[in-house]
Amino acid sequence: MIQKETNLVVADNSGAKKVRCIHVFGGTGRRYASLGDQIIVSVKAAVPGGIVKKKDVCRAVVVRCVKESRRKDGSYIRFDENAVVLLNAQGEPRGTRIFGPVARELRDRKFMKIVSLAPEVL
């Protein structure tokens, strides 16, 4: 469950290291985001010379979430950290590499580029 003011780790090589959620897409009253949901983030820490800089506002998709998520088969998936991948305006990843595992729910949400770049899909 990601909400406004949640701090997240960036799981790609776009240059950002830590971001903070400032908006959850999905209507006025939408409070929480889960695996595969898009959010707007503000970059809080970045590496020098990266694609994105500190204070940049970007779109992102949640790829790992600490709060467990129930699947259709009755199993649950949970991760050790909250992580996102930064997106451009077309919904494609800004980085060229993805670090760490990503959830299978991204395939259902049509984020095929992220799924293909990820080293492991759980």
Swiss-Prot record:
One of its GO terms (biological process) is translation. PROSITE patterns: RIBOSOMAL_L14. This is Large ribosomal subunit protein uL14. Part of the 50S ribosomal subunit. Forms a cluster with proteins L3 and L19. In the 70S ribosome, L14 and L19 interact and together make contacts with the 16S rRNA in bridges B5 and B8. The keyword rRNA-binding applies. One of its GO terms (molecular function) is structural constituent of ribosome. Belongs to the universal ribosomal protein uL14 family. SUPFAM superfamilies: Ribosomal protein L14.
